[in-house]
Amino acid sequence: MGRSISVSFGLLAVFLSLSGTGAGLDCPPDSSPYRYFCYRVFKEQKNWADAERFCAERPNNGHLVSIESMEEAEFVAQLLSKITGKFITHFWIGLRIEDKKQQCRSEWSDGSSVSYDNLLKREFRKCFGLEKGTGYRSWFNLNCEEPYPFVCKVPPNC
């Protein structure tokens, strides 16, 4: 009886430790699971609009990554720190300032609202990325036409 309880407790501990990671998700190849989505880094450089279009054309219709919590920001930072090369300084994320009805407001390319903010410095540029100098943890305004690598966030396979 005691052995059965310790095995059950051990399995419960493993389940709870993996529950926030998305370990049970069926993600496309070369993607990393986290919570309810799959993330993939592309080193190929594109401007913001082309990177967003590329993510939307992926299987499962993704978007440039939206970062909605400090925990998700840390996951993305760790993902980028493993993949980056010496000359890669920025990565596009899905945040952009939109001019709608003469009101400038920030929103994610997937339509979700900005509920978590990690903007280092606000400038007049309309697109945002992560910078190597901050360990890919802070958001920077970048010129939307500059080519940078990017991160796509897609739903898992059904």
From Swiss-Prot:
Its annotated compartments are: Secreted
Pfam families associated with the record: Lectin_C (PF00059)
Mind listing the UniProt keywords for this protein, alphabetically?
Blood coagulation cascade activating toxin, Calcium, Disulfide bond, Hemostasis impairing toxin, Metal-binding, Secreted, Signal, Toxin
Family annotation (InterPro entries): C-type_lectin-like, C-type_lectin-like/link_sf, C-type_lectin/snaclec_domain, C-type_lectin_CS, CTDL_fold
What Gene Ontology molecular function terms does this protein carry? metal ion binding; toxin activity
Q: In which tissues is it expressed?
A: Expressed by the venom gland.
Disulfide pairings: C27-C38, C55-C152, C127-C144
Give every C-type lectin domain span.
34-153
GO cellular component labels: extracellular region
Is the keyword NADP assigned to this protein?
Answer: no
Where in the sequence is the signal peptide annotated? 1-23
Q: What is its main location?
A: secreted
More details: Calcium is required for ligand binding.
Subunit arrangement? Heterotrimer; disulfide-linked. The heterotrimer consists of 1 heavy chain (a metalloproteinase) and 2 light chains: LC1 and LC2.
What does the function comment of this entry state?
Regulatory subunit of the blood coagulation factor X-activating enzyme. Activates coagulation factor X (F10) by cleaving the Arg-Ile bond at position 234, activates coagulation factor IX (F9) by cleaving the Arg-Val bond at position 226 and is also able to activate protein C (PROC). May serve as an exosite by which the enzyme recognizes and binds to the Gla domain of factor X (F10) in a calcium-dependent manner.
State the family named in the UniProt similarity comment for this chain.
Belongs to the snaclec family.
**Name used for this protein in its record:** Snaclec coagulation factor X-activating enzyme light chain 2
Query: Whose protein is this, by species?
Result: Macrovipera lebetinus (Levantine viper)
